[in-house]
Amino acid sequence: MGFTAQQDALVGSSYEAFKQNLPSNSVLFYTLILEKAPAAKDMFSFLKASGPTHSPQLQAHAEKVFGLTRDAAAQLLAKGEVTLADAGLGAVHVQKAVADPHFAVVKEALLKTVQAAVGDKWSEDLSTAWGVAYDGLAAAIKKAMS
């Protein structure tokens, strides 16, 4: 069974909820990442000097990660696979020494952040939709890394 229109709609509507409180959701996202993988702090230039704070760079990067996952959902619905529009993403992830476990940490933080953003609208279906979309994005990035 492929990615469904309902899953795409769930990701789209919850992405809009995420963006409504971008500053706080961005801080939450990176706080969750650093709780699981403190060493990841050095992978993000905007986190090196301090922890997650309300900074334009942090917000822009969080919006990019969530936006790429949103785009992955649309691609999965349209063509059943994810291709990267930015060919440089693989190289950046190689340069930062991103490994498989890092993708799992980001996925967990992403899901918890979406859950916080949507509140009582959180459901297993919503979790699955975001999880599948993120897995598609992660697979495309890993492919570009090799």
Swiss-Prot record:
The keyword 4Fe-4S does not apply. Nitrated in effective nodules and particularly in hypoxic conditions; this mechanism may play a protective role in the symbiosis by buffering toxic peroxynitrite NO(2)(-). Nitration level decrease during nodule senescence. PROSITE patterns: GLOBIN, PLANT_GLOBIN. Keywords: Cytoplasm, Heme, Iron, Metal-binding, Nitration, Nitrogen fixation, Nodulation, Nucleus, Oxygen transport, Phosphoprotein, Transport. Residues 2-146 form the Globin domain. GO terms for cellular component: cytosol; host bacteroid-containing symbiosome; nucleus. It comes from the Eukaryota. Its main location: cytoplasm. Heme b binds at S45, K64, H93, K96. Specifically and strongly expressed in root nodules and at low levels in seedlings. Induction: Accumulates in developing root nodules upon inoculation with the symbiotic M.loti strain MAFF303099. PANTHER family: LEGHEMOGLOBIN-RELATED (PTHR22924), NON-SYMBIOTIC HEMOGLOBIN 2 (PTHR22924:SF92). Belongs to the plant globin family. This is Leghemoglobin 1. It comes from Lotus japonicus (Lotus corniculatus var. japonicus).
